[in-house]
Structures are given as C-alpha cells and as structure tokens.
C-alpha cells in the first residue's frame, strides 16, 4: 500500500480523502517531518505538535481563497507538505531549497511571511478587512501558539478584532498548558455546546436580553454578576469572551476527525471565534516529547533513533561562553540580573536560571517589556543584562531609545546571533543591529573577536555608567584559552597586525571577522602586499585615532563587518574619514558586509564566501583596491 501523502499535491487532493483516512495521513506526515529534520535540522517539536491542526484546517478551508496565517511559522511544515511542496520538502532550510518559514513568494498558499512571534492575528484581521472592503470571497484563519499569546501585539490584534466584530477565526495551539483549561466531563460538555446552533442562538438571545436590562436595580445586578461568575468557573475562555470572541474549547488538538467536525461548525458563528486546541509539542516522536526543556524546538542534525545530535562543534559555542561568563558576573556582583524574552535555552540563560533563579527573568515573548523592565531595575541600582537574539531586539527599538538610552541607564544588551544565522534565513539574520544601535545617543556598541573579548565586553558593560550592547555570532568560538575578564577602555580598539614601514592597505575588522582578515593579510604578504589589521572592538564610539591613523598611513582601507552595509560599521568609518578630510585627500575605501537585501537561508560558511567575507574574498578586495590606487597613481 502506497503512502497517502504521495497522492497529495494540493489541498484539493486532501479534500478527496475520506475523513477516516486522515489519522493515517497525519502519521505519514510526522514521519516525513522527522526524517527531514534529522538531516536538515529545524523546528521539529512545533511541527509535530500541529500536524492534525494543519490537516484539519486545509481539509475544511479552501486555500488560497481562504487565508491561513501562521504565527511564527514553526508549526507550518505540514502546511508545506500539503500545498504542492512535498517533492521539495527535503530541501527545507538548505541553500536553494524551501524556507523554514512561510514566505509569500514561495507559494500562493503562504498568505503571510512570518518568523517572529505574535503577528498572525493582526495580519489576519487586516486581510479579512481588505476582503470586506473589496468584496473578495474567502475566510481568514490565524493559527497562534500559546507562547505567542505572551506577546503584546497578539492582544492588540485580539482587542481590535473583538471591537470590529468581524468573522475572524483564531486557532490557539496550546502545547504548554500556559492557559490552564478546565478538563473533564464538564469541559467536554461545554465544548460541544459552544459549537452547537442551539448554544449560539441561546447566547445571542441572552446577550440581547441583558442589553435591555437596566443596570440600576440590585436584583438585576446580582443576575448579571451570577451569570458572569458562572461562566468564569466553567469556561477557561472568559478572557477571550471578554475581548468579544466566541470561545470554543478546549478540544483535543490531535483528534483530527473531531477537529474537522468542530471547524465545520464554526461557520455558524457571527463575529470572531477562538478555538482552543490542546496539543503536545513533539507529538509522536518520543525523544522530542520527553525533552522537557524544549520539546524538540530548533534542533540541529540528529539521530532519528535516539534524538541525540549527530555532531558537536569542536569549540564551545559563543552562546554557552556568554552564559558561563554571565553566571560568573552574577556570582561576583549580586546586583547583576539576567532577563530574556522566552529564550532561556536559546540564549543560554537556563544556566543562570538554575544557579540564580531569583535573579533570572523570562518575561515571555515580550521584548518591549523586557527592555523597559530592565530600565526600571537599573533606576534602582540593579545591573540588568538583557540577553536576546539580534533579530528580536528590533521589536523593542523605541524602548531602547526612550526608556534606556535617553535616561542613560546602565542596561547591558547581549545580542546573540549577530550576523549570518544560516538555515533560519531572512527573518532571523542578525543583519541590522549595528546600524540601528550606533545612531542612538549614549549607547556603547561592541563586538568581540573571540571568547576572551566576549568576556571582557560583558565585564566592561557591567562597569560602564550607561547603556552598552555587544553582539556575538551563532556558532562555535575560536577555542582560545580563557582569561580573567578585564574592563576595556571605552572606544579603544587594537592593532591586531602591524607591518614594518607603511602598509599598502589597512583592514579594519569588527567582531569575529577579524580572523578572516588576519588570514587574508597572511595570504597578501606572500604576494608582496603589506596589510595591517585593526580589531575595532567598538562600533560606537570608534577608536578614531587608531582607525584614521592607520588609514592615513595606508591610503587604502577595507572595512569588514557581518552586518548590513547601509548605516553599519563601514559607514561609520567612512563618516570618520570624511570628517578628517581623508576622502578628499584621495583615501580609497572598500566596505565589505551584508548587501542591501534580505539574505536568505543557507550554510553560514558558504554564504560568507559568496559575500566576500571569507579570507579569499577579503584578500581579493584588498588586491583590487591596492591595484586601483596604483593605476590612479600611474595616471
């Protein structure tokens, strides 16, 4: 017997299957996801937990006329398999292959591009309103995880949807029980009643009755309070009802037949509806289900039989080095606290949580709150460290400026995943942090070149009387022997490679690009090209004397950064050279970095080579600029 999955090239093919075949299809989808993630890595647990929801939604609704909007997109692998991408699915997260998240350009079934949390409800509501304005057919459904519900924008969307009263369907994929459901016979009874025509008519009748009841008489007030109190006791959805939603659930998110039946009944409702589905992250794969910390979230390559990683980096990852250094600082100074936004494992702060539970805060997917919470702590003498991925700090930009930098509060920002992140692609590249932080007054911006520099920069930030940020990359460190942390002079870089006499070119590197720069300089030396190398350390303030001095000696400069070129570190150097009059005097400058585009997913090493950020690319750029200057001099 062949696989049912092999017969599905579109949602129309899915709809031809009998409902009783759907459980078998779900198991086939699970196996395909497990085998693919074992080779490519990916968000295994979330996708396994949402298989039945994906199948039921596509079985009931008609994409792309009906719009299915995924929050974050971790749970959308089954969606990709059901929408014409089955044959390419094993290319997911690889160079030239499918993206790990929904992307509008990839398929007409990907209604909205996602990767960051809590956006689906707002986007879905916008699509629904656009359909109303244009008269276009189709329904809109947002699938949201319970974790995303900790983000403020999710509740902003719920609030507006309830106010407008449109026919929006929100499916809450609750896989961590963060919204505690009332289980048992009473809950099951209410779920069935909430999805019945009788209950819907009764609800409208009661609502109409209560709207005509005067508020004054004491007896009527007692009736009102009694009804509301009863609802609060018997339904976990009172919050959503209060926002204007019809609440349905909780339902079993792994009973695909029941999900189909429930979704088909939702069409009877007028106005917004929230379906609360209870699921298990990692469902159907024991190693993921038994991983209490992450349930198989964001795995790299692993052995299918055990769920264990296939290989480990030779050197310790920067994330782990940061976490250990932070724990040391927390041990030394009781004022130091750690804050993260739903990323205890991802940022390494789980180590701090285990050692200092009272001084480590996971605020949920609430980056704005995390930053202003840190600002409040700093006001009272605490030294907060906000550990966050570079791409997610973007969400709290106003708070960085208004609540921290403007008041010159000593908040430390530790930006993980600064630079290229590999398989997670466009939505997760740490491309913009240097550009968006260096323009903020009072803020110090640093980037370490190795593990010791990271330790020094954390130590420096915690001893600085003002806000400071440092960014470090995804992946393994250089494997250097660790030193005791030191306070670095603010705005002082170092000459990492000096040359006798006058250099032909000066390479100014930020962060871990230093090592490729040094390798390029060694290769250039064999060709008779003398290259000095500056480890900038600081993107703001720049070490103006060092950088401008070396530039003036060499008359040719190549800057390197693993960040966006517009407004980035190289642009800061160019501004310095312009202020010093070096550009007018004929200084040649070449800036290497990430182009003015969203860099897609792929292998980090290959992408660096393609962008000219490896040793060969840097050497080519140096030869070219030295050659141009020589030609110009000869002319």
Curated annotation (Swiss-Prot):
Catalysed reaction equations from the record: D-glyceraldehyde 3-phosphate + pyruvate + H(+) = 1-deoxy-D-xylulose 5-phosphate + CO2
Cofactor(s) the record lists: Mg(2+); thiamine diphosphate
Enzyme Commission no: 2.2.1.7
Protein keywords: Isoprene biosynthesis, Magnesium, Metal-binding, Thiamine biosynthesis, Thiamine pyrophosphate, Transferase
Gene Ontology biological process terms, A to Z: 1-deoxy-D-xylulose 5-phosphate biosynthetic process; isopentenyl diphosphate biosynthetic process, methylerythritol 4-phosphate pathway; terpenoid biosynthetic process; thiamine biosynthetic process
GO cellular component: cytosol
Residues annotated for Mg(2+) binding in this entry: 146, 175
Sites where the protein binds thiamine diphosphate: 74, 115-117, 147-148, 175, 285, 367
Cofactor note as given: Binds 1 Mg(2+) ion per subunit. Binds 1 thiamine pyrophosphate per subunit.
PANTHER family: 1-D-DEOXYXYLULOSE 5-PHOSPHATE SYNTHASE-RELATED, 1-DEOXY-D-XYLULOSE-5-PHOSPHATE SYNTHASE, CHLOROPLASTIC
Function: Catalyzes the acyloin condensation reaction between C atoms 2 and 3 of pyruvate and glyceraldehyde 3-phosphate to yield 1-deoxy-D-xylulose-5-phosphate (DXP).
Protein family membership: Belongs to the transketolase family. DXPS subfamily.
HAMAP family for this protein: DXP_synth (MF_00315)
Quaternary structure and partners: Homodimer.
Name of protein: 1-deoxy-D-xylulose-5-phosphate synthase
Originating organism: Anaeromyxobacter sp. (strain Fw109-5)
């Amino acid at each position: 017997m062949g696989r049912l999955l092999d017969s599905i090239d579109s949602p129309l093919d899915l709809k031809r299957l009998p409902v009783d075949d759907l459980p078998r299809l779900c198991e086939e989808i699970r196996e395909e996801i497990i085998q693919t993630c074992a080779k490519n890595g990916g968000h295994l647990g979330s996708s396994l937990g949402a298989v039945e929801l994906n199948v039921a939604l596509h079985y009931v609704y008609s994409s792309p006329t009906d719009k299915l909007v995924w929050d974050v997109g971790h749970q959308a692998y089954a969606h990709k398999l059901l929408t014409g991408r089955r044959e390419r699915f094993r290319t997911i997260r690889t160079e030239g292959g499918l993206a790990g998240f929904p992307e509008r350009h990839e398929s007409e079934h990907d209604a909205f591009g996602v990767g960051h949390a809590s956006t689906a409800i707002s986007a879905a509501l916008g699509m629904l309103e656009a359909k109303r304005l244009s008269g276009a057919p189709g329904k809109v459904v947002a699938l949201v995880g319970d974790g995303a519900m900790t983000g403020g924008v999710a509740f902003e969307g719920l609030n507006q949807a309830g106010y407008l009263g449109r026919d929006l369907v929100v499916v809450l994929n609750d896989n961590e029980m963060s919204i505690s459901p009332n289980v048992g016979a009473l809950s099951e009874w209410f779920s069935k009643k909430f999805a019945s025509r009788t209950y819907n008519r009764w609800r409208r009748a009661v609502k109409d009755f209560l709207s005509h009841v005067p508020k004054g008489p004491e007896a009527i007030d007692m009736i009102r309070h009694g009804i509301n109190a009863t609802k609060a006791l018997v339904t976990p959805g009172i919050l959503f009802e209060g926002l204007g939603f019809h609440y349905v659930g909780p339902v079993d998110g792994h009973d695909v037949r029941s999900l189909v039946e429930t979704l088909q009944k939702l069409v009877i409702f007028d106005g917004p509806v929230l379906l609360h589905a209870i699921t298990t992250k990692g469902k159907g794969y024991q190693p993921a289900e038994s991983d209490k910390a992450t349930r198989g979230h964001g795995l790299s390559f692993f052995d299918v039989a055990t769920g264990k990683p296939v290989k480990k980096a030779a050197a310790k990852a920067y994330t782990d080095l940061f976490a250990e250094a932070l724990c040391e600082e927390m041990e030394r100074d009781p004022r130091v606290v750690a804050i993260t936004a739903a990323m205890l494992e991802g940022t390494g702060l789980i180590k701090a949580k285990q050692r200092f539970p009272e001084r480590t805060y996971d605020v949920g997917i609430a980056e704005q709150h995390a930053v202003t919470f840190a600002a409040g702590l700093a006001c009272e003498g605490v030294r907060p460290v906000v550990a966050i991925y570079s791409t997610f700090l973007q969400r709290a930009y106003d708070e960085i400026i208004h609540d921290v930098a403007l008041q010159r509060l000593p908040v430390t920002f530790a930006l993980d995943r600064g630079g290229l992140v590999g398989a997670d692609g466009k939505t997760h590249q740490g491309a913009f942090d240097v550009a968006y932080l260096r323009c903020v007054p009072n803020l110090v911006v640093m980037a370490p070149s190795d593990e010791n520099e990271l330790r020094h920069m954390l130590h420096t930030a915690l001893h600085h009387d003002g806000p400071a940020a440092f960014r470090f990359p995804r992946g393994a460190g250089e494997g250097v022997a660790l030193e005791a942390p030191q306070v670095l002079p603010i705005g002082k870089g170092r000459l990492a490679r000096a040359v006798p006499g006058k250099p032909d070119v000066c390479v100014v590197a930020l962060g871990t690009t230093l090592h490729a720069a040094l390798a390029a300089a060694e290769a250039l030396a064999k060709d008779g090209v003398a290259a000095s190398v500056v480890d900038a350390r600081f993107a703001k303030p720049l070490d103006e004397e060092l950088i401008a001095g070396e530039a003036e000696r060499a008359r040719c400069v190549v800057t390197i950064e693993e960040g966006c070129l517009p407004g980035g570190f190289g642009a800061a150097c160019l501004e310095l050279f312009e202020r010093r009059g070096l550009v007018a005097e004929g200084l040649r400058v070449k800036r290497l970095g990430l182009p003015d585009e969203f860099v897609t997913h792929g292998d980090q090493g290959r992408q660096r080579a393609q962008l000219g950020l490896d040793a060969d690319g840097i050497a080519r750029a140096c030869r070219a600029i030295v050659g141009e200057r020589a030609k110009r001099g000869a002319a």
